[in-house]
Amino acid sequence: RSFATVLKLMEEYPEYKFMSSQAQLYAFVKEDYPEVYEGIKKMIAAGRWEVEGSMWVESDTNVTSGESLVRQFLVGKRFFKDEFGVDNKIMWLPDVFGYSAALPQIMKKAGINYFMTTKISWNEFNKVPYDTFMWKGIDGTEILSHFSPSTDCFDEGDCWQTTYNAYLNPEHILGGWHRYSQKDLNKEYLCTFGHGDGGGGPTRDMLEMGHRMTKGIPGCPKVKQEFAIDFYHDLEKEVKGSRRLPKWSGELYLEFH
């Protein structure tokens, strides 16, 4: 449903760009809905549909063995390369319940340079102090990480939880900017919008609002639609060599569930 909706909206909104992870989803669509799959391939070739995420599925990382995690990257990246000619560079895990300290090393050896999530904001007791930082693994490997701060909350003391299901409207965009912890380091943040966790994707209302916000609304940050990998490339250039770029060593433990 989400993929078919996206293809329809792309016909109506030429500036609209979309990203989806999880090779397994594409494999299902290829087998069951070949006409949708061909439409996806056309949009990828046109530079409007981004395939990223690197893993076969958005995998658990707490109880999963190291070999299984390696195979998630191996099989996932191979599928995206063979089917679409894309070499993934982002580990995209917006809704996974904690992140093993072994991941930075595995990611780097798999050719992954960047990490994204929002779930860690669900901590029950301690707010993770950073949204943009270097994540240091067990062996010392470091990965540039960014937690999407999208939220409709404006009270900085209470804005713990963020969402990957943001509405593309001034409330969520401005709320995310208030919530973003590294404004002294970087002047942009990544906002993922649309109906997820059940599917549906973005709506016409969101795209109409996004079109207007691209032009600028007084008192609200401007938005632009671009691929996640482009955001990370710009982020890396912005923070590279900065002494203000914080580091987090070890496991990213989720204090919830």
Labelled PLM ranges:
Residues 1-257:
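Catalytic-domain carbohydrate-binding cleft regions of carbohydrate-active enzymes
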